[in-house]
Each structure stands twice: as structure tokens, then as C-alpha cells.
Amino acid sequence: MAKQSKPGKAKNIINIFLPGGSAHQESWDPKYLSPAEYRGPLGTVKTNTGERFSENLKNTAKVADKITVIRSMTHGEAAHERGTHNMMTGIRPSPAVIFPSIGSIVSHEFGPRKNLPPYVAIPSQSRNGGTGYLGSAYGAFSLGADPGNSNFRVRDLALPSGIDAKRFG
């Protein structure tokens, strides 16, 4: 068991949500003490806090004291879509009200960030995210494309035609 730490002073949050991504046994929760049929085919690496991550996360294990891994998240929904909505908003889905996502809630609570977007969604806002009743001031800046593509450009950040970098700078 990892030792207890002091309350955090974090000013930023990186929420990694991988719908259809790697299984928890092959990433953050390898279940290394379980029988082979439950723990998966990969080995583990000990983190700098004493926990274990998959061997695929060796570099992340070195900075585990700087992150929070939530292994106890559950919901009572039968469908993945409804469960995802519940996890990303904290509320069960309702046709009557569109609730804000975690990014919008955090940006609302932290307030403005010196002309920076409230939060960034890569590559785009999920179906279960959005500002809900908080309004567009708390919405994500969506890249709108996959940064892994060779021709990737962040939309709306190009200079207007006829303006070159020399004139702009």
C-alpha cells in the first residue's frame, strides 16, 4: 500500500480518458497478485510511491508521486454511454438537463486563466463533455484534429492570408 501524502496544491488537471483504450490490467491496475487469467500478459514495474503499473508505463512509474490514479470508479449504469456520461459529469443522464463536464466544472471553479482557454480537448470534445448550463465561457478549446497526423494544424491559430510572420511579429 502506498504511503499517505499531504493535500495537493495542484493548479492543473490532465484528465486522461481512453474510451475503448487499453485494459486496466495492462495499464494502471495490473492486478499482479491475481491468477494469470485475470492479470493479463504483461509484467509490472514498481512506482516511486510503491504501487505497481504495467511494464508499458515505466516512465510514468517514475513520476507516480505527481499523479493521481483512481482505481475505485464505478457507476450503476448498464450501458457504457450512460456510464461515461455519469463519470464525466457526476450526474446520471437526463433528457431534461444537459450537465457540464468535468472540464467545464473545473474551469468554473478555478476561474479565468490569463487569456488561456478554460481547458483543451484533444482531438475534440467528447459527446459526454460540454458546458451544459454553465455557458460557453467554460467550454473547451478543441484542436479539431489528431496531432499525430503529419499535416496537423491547430484550427483558428493560423495567420490570416496576406499577413506573414514578419509583419505579425
Functional labels for PLM-detected ranges:
Residues 1-169:
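Ligand-binding pockets and gating/stacking loops
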